[in-house]
């Protein structure tokens, strides 16, 4: 590049311009001219793509500041001098670098000598401590092995042994409390006892058996302590408001694994609650509630039904409360028979109140407050027996047995009272009253029956039991009543007796019609009423026929035989007698109500009276029809029969209807 620059600088400016114009205007005359080739090369060079050229020009511009002939001629020398100065400077700098490197080399040589010395010494030391290294390696391996064994031992102990704190919790002190941590420790013992069975299937059977025995002893110790604590807690539950703690509930859950201790604890709870319930019952009877509200139950002893009802209601509430307490106590117990345990303990708790309850109810029943009250008390006892049995659920419970005994006693006294009443009816039978209405004894007995049935209808005794009682009550009352009425009317005439019986039976029927389960009895009474109605219907028809003079004529016609001759030839059946009878019959037809038996006016039921009149009228019409047919029959030799009987049977029916 220096040579090129020098040559370029030596060419005059005008010449260069002429050369360029000549080269551009025509084909070069001397293509092989070196200068021309260089110029063409320079002119064809693309400086933007030649980075080295650009850098060289930039460097040249730094010291080539004046473009003159002199500077162009001396350019080569200037560049060489500058290059020499730069090289001298480079040599000077590298001399310093060399000196530094030599210093470093000396240091490195010293360090190398030191390292060789140390290596030699270490090699010597290594040769001298070879045995120690071997021993150290062995000890390290042994230490690692022992650490692994220690970890295994720690894991084994944590898996199959209790901590000292857990041991202290399980053994505890005699009167110490039981906390949540106790149950966690007990659960840990159970878990270890189950997990140790894995060891029995390995070569560690001896260790497994020892651990199992140790855990079994700890379990027994813990259960014994838990049992004593639970017993103490149960003995303290003597307040009416029994608050079962969560810890005691957990204790019962844990004790279910020891059925004997579990049973003893339940018995202790039942004994404590039994004394509480007995004390509460006696207080309710004699002292009442806090501050005298509610009042003592004994204050209502003058009202037998309320007295018995209040006692039973208190016991029902107490029984339900005790069952709730037991359910709270055993809510976490999962063993079979929990329901039976609750029923058994509730039965034991309520057993203590049976004696005072029985004595008081017996006093009420044996005082014979009356059949109605006895029946209400009987139904009340039956209802509470059914209700409490839903809580106790065991028919063998003493409380249920006592209530059932009192129910049977009240029922027995009730039916004895009814039987006594019935016997009194038969011992002193009253004559029917002059109006042939029901007797006072019948009215009183039916009032009693109505009150009994009304109390029975309003009771909450189960349906099947109510129906059975109904049948027995009706048999005990109605059968003697019917017998009394029959005996009482036995000395009366036919119509009077039938009227009295219809009135009595009608009153019985209207009384029973108000109540359920009486359909069968109502049917029986209706059959008897209809039998006596038939009698009254016949009597009324006979009464009418007798009063109008047709009775003899009708009876004779019915009994007449053809071999006796014609009816007209028989005594009192001639035309004159028939015309006289027809005259009376016409008066009857004009006012039939004037020929009613007096007994019909004594009937209590207007419907029955109308029925008798209607059906007896039909009998009269039928009798007239037979008389009319006989008179109109030529065989009977009546002359001009139309003048004797001038009305046809249809006309008679029309007039009487």
From Swiss-Prot:
Chain spans, region Disordered: 14-36
Origin: domain of life: Eukaryota
Membrane topology: Peripheral membrane protein
Chief localisation class: Golgi
Keywords from the named record: Golgi apparatus, Membrane, Protein transport, Transport
InterPro entries cross-referenced by the UniProt entry: COG6, COG6_C, COG6_N
Protein name, per record: Conserved oligomeric Golgi complex subunit 6
Gene it is expressed from: Cog6
């Amino acid at each position: 590049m220096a040579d090129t620059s020098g040559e370029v600088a030596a060419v005059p400016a005008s010449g260069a311009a002429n050369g360029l114009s000549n080269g551009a205007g025509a084909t070069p005359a001397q293509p092989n001219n070196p200068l021309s080739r260089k110029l063409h090369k320079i002119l064809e060079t693309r400086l933007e793509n030649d980075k080295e050229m650009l850098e060289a020009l930039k460097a040249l511009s730094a010291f080539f500041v004046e473009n003159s002939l002199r500077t162009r001629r001396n350019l080569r020398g200037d560049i060489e001098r500058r290059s020499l100065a730069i090289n001298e400077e480079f040599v000077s700098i590298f001399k310093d670098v060399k000196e530094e490197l030599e210093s470093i080399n000396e240091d490195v040589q010293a360090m190398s000598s030191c390292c060789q010395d140390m290596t030699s010494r270490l090699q010597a030391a290594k040769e001298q401590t070879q045995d120690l290294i071997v021993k150290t390696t062995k000890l390290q391996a042994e230490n690692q092995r022992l650490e692994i064994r220690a970890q295994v031992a720690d894991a084994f102990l944590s898996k199959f042994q209790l901590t000292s704190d857990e041991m202290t919790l399980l053994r505890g002190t005699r009167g110490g409390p039981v906390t949540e941590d106790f149950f966690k420790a007990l659960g840990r013992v159970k878990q270890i006892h189950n997990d140790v069975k894995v060891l029995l299937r390995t070569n560690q059977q001896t260790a497994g058996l020892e651990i199992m025995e140790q855990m079994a002893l700890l379990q027994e110790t813990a259960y014994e302590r838990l049992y004593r604590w639970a017993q103490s807690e149960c003995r303290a539950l003597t307040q009416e408001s029994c608050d079962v703690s969560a810890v005691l509930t957990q204790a019962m859950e844990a004790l279910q694994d020891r059925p004997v201790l579990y049973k003893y604890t339940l018995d202790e709870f039942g004994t404590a609650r039994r004394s509480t319930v007995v004390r509460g019952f006696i207080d309710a009877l004699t002292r009442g509630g806090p501050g005298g509200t509610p009042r003592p139950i004994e204050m209502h002893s003058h009202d037998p039904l309320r007295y018995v009802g209040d006692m039973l209601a208190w016991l029902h509430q107490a029984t339900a409360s005790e069952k709730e307490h037991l359910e709270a106590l055993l809510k976490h117990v999962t063993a079979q028979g929990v329901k039976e345990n609750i029923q058994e303990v509730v039965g034991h708790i309520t057993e203590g109140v049976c004696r005072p309850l029985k004595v008081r109810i017996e006093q009420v029943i044996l005082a014979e407050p009356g059949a109605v009250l006895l029946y209400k008390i009987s139904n009340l006892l039956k209802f509470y027996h059914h209700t409490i049995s839903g809580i106790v659920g065991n028919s063998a419970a003493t409380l249920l047995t006592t209530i059932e005994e009192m129910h049977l006693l009240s029922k027995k006294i009730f039916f004895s009272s009814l039987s006594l009443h019935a016997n009194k009816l038969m011992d002193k039978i009253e004559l029917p009253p002059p109006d042939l209405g029901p007797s006072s004894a019948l009215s009183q007995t039916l009032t009693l029956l109505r009150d009994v049935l009304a109390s029975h209808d309003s009771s909450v005794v189960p349906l099947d039991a109510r129906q059975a009682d109904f049948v027995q009550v009706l048999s005990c009352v109605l059968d003697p009543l019917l017998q009394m009425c029959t005996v009482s009317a036995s000395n009366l005439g036919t119509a009077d007796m039938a009227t009295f019986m219809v009135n009595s039976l009608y009153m019985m029927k209207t009384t029973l019609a108000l109540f359920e389960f009486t359909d069968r009895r109502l049917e029986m009474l209706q059959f008897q009423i209809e039998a006596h109605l038939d009698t009254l219907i016949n009597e009324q028809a006979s009464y009418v026929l007798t009063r109008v003079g047709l009775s003899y004529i009708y009876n004779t016609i019915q009994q007449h035989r053809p071999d006796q001759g014609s009816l007209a030839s028989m005594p009192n059946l001639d035309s004159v007698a028939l015309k006289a009878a027809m005259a009376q019959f016409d008066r009857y037809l004009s006012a039939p109500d004037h020929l009613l038996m007096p007994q019909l006016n004594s009937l209590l039921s207007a419907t029955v009276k109308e029925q008798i009149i209607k059906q007896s009228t039909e009998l009269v019409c039928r009798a007239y029809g037979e008389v009319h047919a006989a008179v109109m029959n030529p065989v009977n030799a009546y002359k001009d029969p139309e003048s004797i009987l001038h009305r046809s049977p249809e006309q008679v029916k029309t007039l009487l209807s």
